[in-house]
């Protein structure tokens, strides 16, 4: 049994018969074999690549990198996400089967980093696009920090109920329409223009100056790129 934390065993008899719940058994199997999809766009991904070597050996955590989102249950975003890349990231997230998890690695992924000040094309935080489970700050984070983030994610998985997670994600989902980004009633806050609504493909060429509001932070109700 994995000693990371849960599932809690209800009882153990003298005959070594272990009883538990299907949900705990499912959580234990998932936290012991995470299959990540590596979405690296910048220098933070180089730090994650060092985990593959013999010094850190991330295979001992059951991590099996996948090249297809349909075979992955964890997406690790590392690096800057631009407005043109945003629909592709959301599409990859949609193609992953439930339950699925996200680790945001590095300052550029979490807040936009040094590109968020004057850049017209940088997304100020990947949580504007997809729900994030674990934030991993740093520029770049060390491999030890990546291992710590994976450990925290495994603890979170061990405590959750799959049905509750699926319901909460279905209420605030990101999805693509004709390869365009369209966010419905997001609970996240940001500096995006609130009045930008989805109209037609001919009206989607929105200037970058009107896309962000630097004066006040408002809830992002609808967003189109």
From Swiss-Prot:
Membrane topology recorded in Swiss-Prot or TrEMBL: Peripheral membrane protein
Names of the cofactor(s): [4Fe-4S] cluster
UniProt GO MF annotations: 4 iron, 4 sulfur cluster binding; iron ion binding; NADH dehydrogenase (ubiquinone) activity; quinone binding
Its EC number(s): 7.1.1.-
Highest taxon of the lineage: Eukaryota
Location in or out of the cell: Plastid, Chloroplast thylakoid membrane
Biological process per Gene Ontology, one example term: electron transport coupled proton transport
Residues at which [4Fe-4S] cluster binds: 43-44, 108, 139
UniProt entry keywords in alphabetical sequence: 4Fe-4S, Chloroplast, Iron, Iron-sulfur, Membrane, Metal-binding, NAD, NADP, Plastid, Plastoquinone, Quinone, Thylakoid, Translocase, Transport
A GO cellular-component term linked to this record: chloroplast thylakoid membrane
UniProt-listed SUPFAM superfamilies: HydA/Nqo6-like (SSF56770)
Extent of the signal sequence: none
Catalytic activities: a plastoquinone + NADH + (n+1) H(+)(in) = a plastoquinol + NAD(+) + n H(+)(out); a plastoquinone + NADPH + (n+1) H(+)(in) = a plastoquinol + NADP(+) + n H(+)(out)
Binding note for cofactor: Binds 1 [4Fe-4S] cluster.
Its job: NDH shuttles electrons from NAD(P)H:plastoquinone, via FMN and iron-sulfur (Fe-S) centers, to quinones in the photosynthetic chain and possibly in a chloroplast respiratory chain. The immediate electron acceptor for the enzyme in this species is believed to be plastoquinone. Couples the redox reaction to proton translocation, and thus conserves the redox energy in a proton gradient.
Family recorded in the similarity comment: Belongs to the complex I 20 kDa subunit family.
PANTHER family: NADH DEHYDROGENASE (PTHR11995), NADH DEHYDROGENASE [UBIQUINONE] IRON-SULFUR PROTEIN 7, MITOCHONDRIAL (PTHR11995:SF14)
Protein name: NAD(P)H-quinone oxidoreductase subunit K, chloroplastic
Taxonomic source organism: Triticum aestivum
Lineage: Eukaryota, Viridiplantae, Streptophyta, Embryophyta, Tracheophyta
Gene: ndhK
């Amino acid at each position: 049994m994995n000693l990371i934390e849960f599932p809690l065993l209800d009882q153990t008899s003298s005959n070594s018969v272990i009883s538990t719940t299907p949900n705990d058994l499912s959580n234990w199997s998932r936290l012991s074999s995470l299959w990540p999809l590596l979405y690296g766009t910048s220098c933070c991904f180089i730090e994650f690549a060092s985990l593959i070597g013999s010094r850190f050996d991330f295979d001992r955590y059951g991590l099996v990198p996948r090249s297809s989102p349909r075979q992955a249950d964890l997406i690790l975003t590392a690096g800057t996400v631009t407005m043109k890349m945003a629909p592709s990231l959301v599409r990859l997230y949609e193609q992953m089967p439930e339950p699925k998890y996200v680790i945001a690695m590095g300052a550029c992924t979490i807040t936009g980093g040094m590109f968020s000040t004057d850049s017209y094309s940088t997304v100020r935080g990947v949580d504007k696009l997809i729900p994030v489970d674990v934030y991993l700050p740093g520029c770049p984070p060390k491999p030890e920090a990546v291992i710590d983030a994976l450990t925290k994610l495994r603890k979170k998985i061990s405590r959750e109920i799959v049905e509750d997670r699926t319901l909460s994600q279905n209420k605030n989902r990101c999805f693509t329409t004709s390869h365009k980004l369209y966010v419905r009633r997001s609970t996240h806050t940001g500096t995006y223009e609130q009045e930008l609504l989805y109209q037609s493909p001919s009206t989607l060429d929105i200037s970058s100056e009107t896309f962000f509001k630097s004066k006040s932070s408002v809830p992002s109700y609808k967003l189109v790129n």
